[in-house]
Every structure is written in structure tokens, then in C-alpha cells.
Curated annotation (Swiss-Prot):
Official protein name in the record: Olfactory receptor 5G26
Cleaved signal peptide residues: none
InterPro entries linked to this entry: GPCR_Rhodpsn, GPCR_Rhodpsn_7TM, Olfact_rcpt
Annotated organism of origin: Mus musculus (Mouse)
Predominant cellular place of this UniProt entry's protein: membrane
Amino acid sequence: MMHRNQTVVTEFFFTGLTSSFHLQIVLFLTFLCVYLATLLGNLGMIILIHLDTRLHIPMYFFLSHLSFVDACSSSVISPKMLSDMFVDKKVISFLGCAIQLCLFSQFVVTECFLLASMAYDRYVAICKPLLYTLIMSQRVCVQLVIGPYSIGFVSTMVHIISAFVLPYCGPNLINHFFCDLLPVLSLACANTQMKKRLLFIVAGILGVFSGIIILVSYVYIAITILKISSADGRRKAFSTCSSHLTAVSILYGTLFFIYVRPSSSFSLDINKVVSLFYTTVIPMLNPFIYSLRNKEVKDALIRTFEKQFCYSFQDKIL
């Protein structure tokens, strides 16, 4: 039980990225450009998929939701991080911290399972091409999108309830630039070993489960590709998966580094650097990975620009 003379924490302060003013300017300009590129790339991808009817297939339906999740997850972190760059007191309310943690956790878990849904879609497309339209019906696609959002919501509630039912009565300086779960738990006025163990177990189960779906899908995909007689056929089949594999490798590598490591190797400072990568850089990279390495997206982009140019040219003539 808490003593009456203990102070209940109503707000938290961030240590931020650096205390050097000159470095803050460089970081501010860098991550402002990264955030703008993230919004432009992901929202542009959503609009492109919506406008081009040739992209109205399951693969790009999932990609549009991935772009939405990336834009949202970046917007949960980046605006606050950028606004805190040049203020002495980087403060956030207790409720604001809970909301930021809730939203970011939701989008991260959702992205992991969206990538699993996309892996299953690639498996059906390559391994069962004749049954693709039958298996990947509109109903199934909607279910494969609702599922990740639902899993993200449930897992987020587990983490939020675990973290914010604890008493916070002493230190309120978070060694981070946003409200991440482990740094927040380290400030609780209670033994958090069980909570951290729960985080490790839940993160491990979610990561392993979604990872197994992706791994099994690609094992079957690899077996099918190896059975293709022509080298050109194998290359085309692999090219449809290369963008997805790149996105999966980058995201899962950073998440496992932070959340599924033994506690003996845990370091808040190292996590801060890695978190900076997966909260700001990865959401920016995904649309470029899928567009630069995907002929259909590049062709759709060219068609959209040509169509808009023709419309504007006709308006000028008329």
C-alpha cells in the first residue's frame, strides 16, 4: 500500500535524443524530412492504389492498409518528438503517455500480422495460382485485415493494463523520446519483474506466431519456385516476394532486438537508438521498398501521372 506522503505522478518528462543544441538542429531537420517523406510516401501509395483499378487486387489491398498503419504509427511519435527538440522540459501527461503507448503498440502489432497476411497472400498466388481468386475472396481479404487490427487491440490492452495499474509515485523521467513500455515500467514504484516477464512472453508469442506464418508461407513458396523449370519464371516469381521479404526482415529484426531479448542484455540507451530507427525510418522505407522494387506500382504511378497530365493539357486547350 502506498503511503500518504508519496506523490502520485501526473506527468512524465523525456530525456530526448541529445542535449547538444547544434545536434538537435541536425536531428530536427533530418527527422522532419523523414516524417514528411513518410506521410507523402504512404498516403501517396494509398491514393495510387485507390485511383488505379489495376491495383484493385488482394496484394495491394493489404499494402494500402500497411501504408495506413505506417502513416499512423509515425504520426503517433514524430510530431511530439519534433516539437520537443527545442524545449527544455519535454513533458507529457500521464494520460497522454498512456494514449501514445496504446496507439503505437496497436499499430506495431497490427503491422506484424498484416505482414503475415501478405505472406499468406503471396503463398496462395504462387503455390495455388488457379485457386487464387476463389481462396482470396473479398470476404477472406477483409478477415485477413480485421484479424491483425483485432490482435493488435487485444495485445495492447494487456500491456496497457499491466503498465498503468502500477503505482507511479517517485521518478518521472523517462529515458526515451516517447512512451515505450519498458522505460515506463522502469519508473513504477513496485516490483515489475512479473510485468516485464509478461511483456517478454506476450511479445514472444505474437512475434513467433506471426513469424511462423511468414516462415511457413515462404518455405512453401521457395519449394514451388524451385520446381519452376525456367530461370525467367523463377526470377519473376521471386520478384513478387522480394519487397515483402525486405520489409519483414527490417521490421522483425528491430522488434526482436528490443522486445524479445534476455533481460541481461537490456539497455535503455541502445533501445533508444534502435527505436529511433523503427519508429521513424521503417515507416518511411516501406512505400519506397514496395514501389521501387515493384513493376506494377511503378507502371501505375506512370499511368496516373500521364492521365493527370492529359487532363490538365485538355483543360488548357479548352
